[in-house]
Regions:
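Short alpha-helical segments enriched in small residues
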Residues: 1-156
């Protein structure tokens, strides 16, 4: 799925940048393995620890305290902040709960991921649940994000 997504971006002369929390660079890694990586991958930033979200990406304490680091609201803000760091066409931010120890609740169990795709003047928000081992969850979220990028680019 990554290669299909990267090919679509390359065919449309679009670049992508990633801001990754729970995926910790996995999305950037997957794109770097594509034959089209040199044409599409601008780079990425891992903000696994909340201090990076605050100090590097300027996400406010208030937003994090109100919604938690793993939330739709913080993920959307990561897309906004990524536009100040990267000159890309597509911006992807992902937060979530890969394993226990984050902000999981009954309503937001481990396996919940939030991702946002910024394209042109729009931001598209997604909330998904992935099951399995951490590795299986990473593979699932990568596939889901690639499919969403394809849908966003094709339908915009």
């Amino acid at each position: 799925m990554t290669d299909s997504c990267a090919k679509l971006l390359a065919d449309n002369q679009l670049t992508v940048a990633f801001i990754e929390s729970a995926t910790a660079g996995y999305l950037s890694h997957c794109f770097s393995m594509s034959l089209y990586s040199g044409d599409v991958l601008m780079g990425g930033l891992v903000c696994y620890d909340v201090s990076i979200k605050k100090k590097v990406l300027n996400v406010s304490d208030q937003l994090i305290d109100e919604f938690t680091p793993e939330s739709a609201e913080v993920t959307r803000e990561l897309v906004h902040q990524s536009k100040l760091l990267f000159d890309a066409d597509v911006y992807v931010a992902c937060t979530g709960l890969l394993k226990p120890g984050g902000s999981e609740t009954e309503e937001k169990p481990v396996g919940t991921f939030f991702y946002c795709i910024g394209y042109k003047s729009e931001i598209y928000d997604f909330r998904v649940f992935c099951e399995g081992s951490p590795e299986q969850k990473l593979n699932s979220i990568n596939s889901l994000i690639c499919k969403s990028i394809i849908d966003v680019v094709n339908n915009h």
